């Protein structure tokens, strides 16, 4: 029996603008298992990114619960939420959000610095991760000196520096060409298998999503279909 890492229970989300209410998510239920690679596919505006943000405590649900390792993420203090984001969750975005004035090594180590870890050890861990993502020769380069695919690899390494239980990736290949995007997905699969980290990846590309262990389809705020894939 698989161990459940994250549970989304009857989560709904709506936005209000005067008399107008926009329903984005409707009673979404979801389980993410330890170490699995889960893809959520859907068209733009289907609610998939909103769900990912709620899973990562970046947006509050209008109703429902989100539990990570049994802890209700919306029944804890904002300080505890920040601690969870830094220690237990990793984030990868379509646009890498690397700090432009810092090297690849410093960008990867930054979450560990924020956590208060020893700087020498944090940089040593960052070096190992950069080597693991194939950038051992680019550690001293700033983002402007890296290609789009290389910058996204740095972002993946940064997401893993604090050894999170779960990494949430929002369109991680959306800003890359097909070849670079495919390489990023292969890297995610490889790292998930090596490190035992769970990944939830939001994408509009069903071909890339099909590489993951499991696939859910989001349509009009509902999770509609599940497809199983060979390992």
Swiss-Prot record:
InterPro entries: AAA+_ATPase, ABC_transporter-like_ATP-bd, ABC_transporter-like_CS, ABC_transpr_LolD-like, LolD_lipo_ATP-bd, MacB-like_ATP-bd, P-loop_NTPase
EC number of this enzyme: 7.6.2.-
UniProt GO molecular function: ATP binding; ATP hydrolysis activity; transmembrane transporter activity
Entry binding sites for ATP: 42-49
Membrane topology term: Peripheral membrane protein
Main localization (coarse): membrane
Keyword Cell membrane attributed: yes
Keywords associated with the record: ATP-binding, Cell inner membrane, Cell membrane, Membrane, Nucleotide-binding, Translocase, Transport
One Pfam assignment: ABC_tran
GO terms for cellular component: plasma membrane
Enzyme class, spelled out: translocase
Top-level taxonomic group: Bacteria
Subcellular compartments: Cell inner membrane
Domain ABC transporter: 6-231
A GO biological-process term: lipoprotein localization to outer membrane
Function according to Swiss-Prot or TrEMBL: Part of the ABC transporter complex LolCDE involved in the translocation of mature outer membrane-directed lipoproteins, from the inner membrane to the periplasmic chaperone, LolA. Responsible for the formation of the LolA-lipoprotein complex in an ATP-dependent manner.
Family label: Belongs to the ABC transporter superfamily. Lipoprotein translocase (TC 3.A.1.125) family.
Assembly mode: The complex is composed of two ATP-binding proteins (LolD) and two transmembrane proteins (LolC and LolE).
Name of this chain's protein: Lipoprotein-releasing system ATP-binding protein LolD
Organism: Shewanella sp. (strain MR-7)
Lineage, broadest ranks: Bacteria, Pseudomonadati, Pseudomonadota, Gammaproteobacteria, Alteromonadales
The encoding gene: lolD
